[in-house]
Amino acid sequence: MVEFYFDIETHSPSEKPNVAQDKIITIQYRELSPDGNPRGDLQILTEWDCGSEKALLETFAKVFLTENTWDFVPVGFNLYGFDLLSLLLRFNHHFGTSHGLSWFYDKPVLDIKPVLVIMGRCFKGCGDPFGKQSPNPIRGWYESGETGRQQNIDYIVRESNRFISILQSLKWDIPRLREGLQKVVVT
């Protein structure tokens, strides 16, 4: 099983994001060791470097859609609620596929959002540790063209580093939690 930090950024022309229509403008991923340490560099695929959203998706498909579902296990935050759903819908849009949510049933995924919700005992604010800004500045940077590209990249790198730090902490703490749960089950 090869875990990869995984995230996307999208451009929404309207005030609120629309996962069914918003264009994917970046896909970023980084291989992780079993304890969450980065292996290799953060890969940032951008719509502007690839030439189009469709070309971006074609490039990522070579890494993501292999014959072995364990070759790329996405690890991230809110993957089922946003990133993977957006990816699925944009693949359907560009390639005429009709994949439903069942497309991901056999795909191993580690989404840490439920863990952070349980830890904070609420949904509101569970993504705060990643430094998400509200309103999201990605839209403005993207719309400013070439001048905003480096700001997008810097934001992505910071968010990736924060996520990896949180993941490493969780991977350290969860075995201790498991020991505590085993004591509860035994008694």
Set out the residue ranges of the language-model regions.
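Conserved RNase H-like, two-metal-ion catalytic cores of nucleic-acid enzymes
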Residues: 1-66
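Metal-dependent phosphoesterase core characteristic of DEDDh/y 3'-5' exonuclease domains
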Residues: 23-28, 39-40, 71-187
